[in-house]
A protein has these predicted regions:
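Walker A/P-loop NTP-binding motif of AAA+ ATPase domains
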Residues: 1-163
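C-terminal alpha-helical "lid" subdomain
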Residues: 123, 135-136, 140-214
Length: 214
């Protein structure tokens, strides 16, 4: 079949969207992120119409189609218990056909591969898992992001870098912590120290409903 179908799966913040953007940049193709709230409709036939527009334009402009967190469209199909279920499965059948016929690149991202219907899984040429960075990789991410800051001083010792690297966070979460630390340090006209960074880490852990002591 024509085209290339790619599935990225893994926890939030592990780089799925960033990798899609890098791929587009390397191939010099625009990555079109599909807003599922604008595509999926409760009205019969509307979802197919919206998908048709997206695929037609993407084929004409040679876009890379990126279904970010596309579980609403690519999720497991329901049993035929009602007329609504039958229409939902018609949407799936239509989407399967458009994917089969699409000559370009399609990327789907999801947090859980098991959420994706097997009918779609069979059609992906590449399935890649994005995992959380290990402690060494986290240390490298912390060092890279904090060393790039120019608007204020960063005052963390080697021991403190090692300490913050012990907390399991995604690359996206570490980026959020660094941005929080930078904003707070600039607001108070102070250097970034371990206390501010720990505040940012706690904020991220609360978002994920994870409790820890630092």
């Amino acid at each position: 079949k024509p085209g290339l179908k790619i599935l990225f799966y893994g926890k939030p913040g592990t780089g799925k969207s960033q990798t899609a953007a890098i791929l587009g940049n390397e191939l010099k193709s625009q990555v079109y992120r599909i807003d599922l709230s604008q595509v999926v409709s409760k009205y019969i036939g509307e979802t197919e119409k919206n998908l048709s527009k997206v695929f037609d334009i993407a084929e004409y402009k040679n876009w890379i189609l990126f279904f970010d967190e596309g579980d609403a469209l690519f999720g497991k199909r329901t049993a035929l218990n009602s007329s609504n279920d039958r229409y939902a499965n018609q949407e799936v059948a239509y989407l399967l056909q458009r994917i089969e016929d699409f000559a370009g690149i399609i990327i789907l991202s999801t947090n859980l591969k098991d959420n994706i219907d097997t009918a779609f899984l069979r059609r992906f040429h590449i399935i890649t898992e994005f995992v959380l960075p290990d402690i060494k990789q986290r240390g490298q991410i912390w060092l890279k992001l904090l060393s790039e800051i120019k608007s204020c001083k960063v005052q963390l010792s080697k021991t403190e870098y090692e300490e913050i690297s012990k907390t399991e966070l995604s690359g996206g979460a570490i980026t959020n912590v660094v941005n929080y630390s930078l904003l707070k340090a600039n607001y108070y006209k102070k250097p970034i120290k371990i206390e501010i960074v720990k505040e940012g880490i706690i904020r991220e852990l609360r978002k994920e409903n994870r409790l820890t002591s630092l």
